[in-house]
């Protein structure tokens, strides 16, 4: 819970800075790349959690990573600040929170669309258009297949689920029949 509060504080500051400089998307891309490098490299994560490494050594490791990733100056300074404050371990949570706050700032939603069968592009675009019209926001859908739905679509937007799957409809009919 503490890490969530810390992540939110850092992410919020970076979103505000990105918004002021019109660099929200660039920051997002750079943070995803750096976070991906950390996620894929256990030794790198261990180095930042290891007290045997001095603060200067950790800063140099981060500088090398920043140079390889060709991060912007603002993201580079942000990452070095995380090293200074010993918050690099919070990077995954910061990036996740940044994405959510950046989407809110930009008016973007990322619904999860689950169907029983794979959708073609025209079907995804039709659902996307309907959601954009309903929400008034830009929609960036994520689509997955779950054959247990039998048919229909389940759309999850944050905490709200729109379930028009055959599986759910059959379950409702079953409940009605059992209750009499």
UniProtKB/Swiss-Prot annotation:
Name the protein family.
Belongs to the ATPase delta chain family.
Xref: NCBIfam families? ATP_synt_delta, PRK05758.2-2, PRK05758.2-4
What InterPro entries would the database entry show? ATP_synth_OSCP/delta_N_sf (IPR026015), ATPase_OSCP/dsu (IPR000711)
Q: Which GO terms describe its molecular function?
A: proton-transporting ATP synthase activity, rotational mechanism
The UniProt entry lists membrane topology as: Peripheral membrane protein
Gene that this polypeptide is encoded by: atpH
Q: Which UniProt keywords apply?
A: ATP synthesis, Cell inner membrane, Cell membrane, CF(1), Hydrogen ion transport, Ion transport, Membrane, Transport
Primary residence: membrane
Protein localization = Cell inner membrane
Question: What organism does this protein naturally occur in?
Answer: Trichlorobacter lovleyi (strain ATCC BAA-1151 / DSM 17278 / SZ) (Geobacter lovleyi)
- Subunit and interaction comment: F-type ATPases have 2 components, F(1) - the catalytic core - and F(0) - the membrane proton channel. F(1) has five subunits: alpha(3), beta(3), gamma(1), delta(1), epsilon(1). F(0) has three main subunits: a(1), b(2) and c(10-14). The alpha and beta chains form an alternating ring which encloses part of the gamma chain. F(1) is attached to F(0) by a central stalk formed by the gamma and epsilon chains, while a peripheral stalk is formed by the delta and b chains.
Q: What does this protein do?
A: F(1)F(0) ATP synthase produces ATP from ADP in the presence of a proton or sodium gradient. F-type ATPases consist of two structural domains, F(1) containing the extramembraneous catalytic core and F(0) containing the membrane proton channel, linked together by a central stalk and a peripheral stalk. During catalysis, ATP synthesis in the catalytic domain of F(1) is coupled via a rotary mechanism of the central stalk subunits to proton translocation. This protein is part of the stalk that links CF(0) to CF(1). It either transmits conformational changes from CF(0) to CF(1) or is implicated in proton conduction.
Per the record, the domain of life is Bacteria
Q: What is this protein called?
A: ATP synthase subunit delta
A GO cellular component annotation in the UniProt record: plasma membrane
Gene3D superfamilies from the UniProt entry: N-terminal domain of the delta subunit of the F1F0-ATP synthase (1.10.520.20)
């Amino acid at each position: 819970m503490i890490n969530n509060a810390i992540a939110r504080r850092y992410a919020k500051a970076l979103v505000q800075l990105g918004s002021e400089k019109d660099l929200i998307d660039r920051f997002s891309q750079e943070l995803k790349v750096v976070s991906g490098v950390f996620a894929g490299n256990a030794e790198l994560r261990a180095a930042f959690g290891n007290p045997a490494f001095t603060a200067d050594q950790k800063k140099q490791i981060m500088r090398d990573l920043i140079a390889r990733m060709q991060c912007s100056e603002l993201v580079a300074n942000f990452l070095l600040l995380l090293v200074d404050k010993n918050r690099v371990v919070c990077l995954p949570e910061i990036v996740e929170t940044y994405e959510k706050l950046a989407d809110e700032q930009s008016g973007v939603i990322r619904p999860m669309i689950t169907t029983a069968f794979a959708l073609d592009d025209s079907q995804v675009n039709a659902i996307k258009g309907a959601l954009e019209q309903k929400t008034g926001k830009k929609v960036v859908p994520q689509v997955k297949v779950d054959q247990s739905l039998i048919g229909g679509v389940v759309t999850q937007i944050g905490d709200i689920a729109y379930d028009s799957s055959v599986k759910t409809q059959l379950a409702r009919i079953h409940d009605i029949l059992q209750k009499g």
